[in-house]
């Protein structure tokens, strides 16, 4: 009889590992730890993953900000677009231009019975400052819509009351009260400052004094220079506000208000300090001087009682929101300027605003 123990290994008893198992386990564990990353490496990779995830989520959310920024929704797919037609508009220029584009879209869409949607770029510019309500049209949706471009002049025309087409993208640089002034209350509501933006501006103004006393009248002054220093004399045959204009504008308010305080904002504060007479001790150079961060300067201007502006849509919008009296630079281009073909002063400045003519002597010398 064969002794089976001599030809085959004996099976282990139930519930016990095979013979030699501890040695195999030790060998496997050794190989695992030899190839497995260290704990510090694992932690480092986890941090990289987390940071990358947050970064990309932030970029994604930048186009779809938190609900407080607007009351509408983000349209992701064409089937979500409302029936009856849609208006949108290009997002060109900086803050003042895009405010004009937004207000024009708001008014013309309502006038034509269309739904209005803004591009993400416009939302990114306006929503951090204002409590705008128009919904955002996602880029992926916009690319799949058969848009019909419709160019607008800078002022309202009768034909804009009946704009043809189902999906219309308005183009141009519209910024005129003639588009939207009949909806002034609604436009002011759209451009209501967020509470924290308004409170920061008001806290700054409350801390200002004229000869030791808190002023009863604040006059915001916006001096636009920047690229206009080059563009205005060469391209448009015009001039910017000079020392004489600013002196006349400030004196206009001094003659009508007791101890007003002038709050100066500008993209060239050094020029303002050299050219604005502050000997009356009623001038505060308050602006940041930074074009890239306009919210603070804009908020300061809108919280003042009255406004002095020079050129540009930034100042025009600040004056429109502030209310009160506004003094503006008038007749700042020569009669033959191409600027007069695309800009109508009577459509840019409200009728009750006060114009002070620019000194065109330098422009005439440059363009005889």
Curated annotation (Swiss-Prot):
Segments on the Lumenal side according to the record's topology features: 53-368
Reactions the enzyme catalyzes: a ganglioside GM1 + GDP-beta-L-fucose = a ganglioside Fuc-GM1 + GDP + H(+)
Organism: Bos taurus
Top-level taxon in the UniProt lineage: Eukaryota
Gene Ontology cellular component annotations, sorted alphabetically: Golgi cisterna membrane
Membrane topology note: Single-pass type II membrane protein
Name listed for the protein in its UniProt record: Galactoside 2-alpha-L-fucosyltransferase SEC1
Tissues expressing the protein: Kidney.
């Amino acid at each position: 009889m064969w002794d089976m123990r001599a030809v085959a290994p004996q099976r282990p008893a139930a519930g016990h590992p095979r013979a030699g198992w501890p040695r195999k386990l030790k060998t496997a564990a050794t190989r695992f730890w030899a190839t497995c990353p260290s704990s510090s490496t694992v932690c480092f990779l986890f941090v990289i993953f987390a940071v990358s995830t947050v970064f990309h989520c932030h970029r994604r959310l930048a186009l779809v900000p938190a609900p407080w920024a607007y009351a509408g929704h983000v349209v992701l797919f064409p089937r979500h677009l409302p029936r009856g037609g849609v208006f949108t508009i290009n997002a060109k220029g900086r803050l003042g231009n895009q405010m004009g584009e937004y207000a024009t879209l708001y008014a013309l869409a309502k006038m034509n019975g269309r739904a209005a949607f803004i591009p993400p770029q416009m939302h990114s510019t306006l929503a951090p400052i204002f409590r705008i309500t128009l919904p955002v049209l996602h880029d992926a949706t916009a690319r799949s819509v058969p848009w019909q471009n419709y160019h607008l002049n800078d002022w309202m025309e009768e034909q804009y009351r009946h704009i043809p087409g189902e999906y219309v993208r308005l183009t141009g640089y519209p910024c005129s009260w003639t588009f939207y002034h009949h909806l002034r209350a609604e436009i002011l509501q759209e451009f209501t400052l967020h509470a924290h933006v308004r409170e920061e501006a008001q806290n700054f103004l409350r801390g200002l004094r004229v000869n030791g006393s808190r002023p009863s009248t604040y006059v915001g002054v916006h001096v636009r220079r920047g690229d206009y220093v080059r563009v205005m004399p060469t391209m448009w045959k015009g001039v910017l506000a000079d020392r004489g204009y600013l002196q006349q504008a400030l004196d206009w308010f001094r003659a009508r208000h007791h101890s007003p305080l002038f709050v100066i904002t500008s993209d060239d504060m050094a020029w303002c300090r050299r050219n604005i007479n502050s000997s009356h001790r009623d001038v505060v150079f308050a602006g940041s001087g930074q074009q890239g961060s306009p919210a603070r300067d804009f908020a300061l201007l809108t919280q003042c009682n009255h406004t002095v502006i020079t050129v540009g849509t930034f100042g025009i919008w600040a004056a429109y929101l502030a209310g009160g009296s506004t003094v503006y630079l008038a007749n700042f281009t020569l009669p033959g300027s191409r600027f007069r073909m695309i800009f109508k002063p009577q459509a840019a400045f409200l009728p009750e605003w006060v114009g002070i003519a620019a000194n065109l002597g330098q422009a005439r010398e440059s363009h005889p």
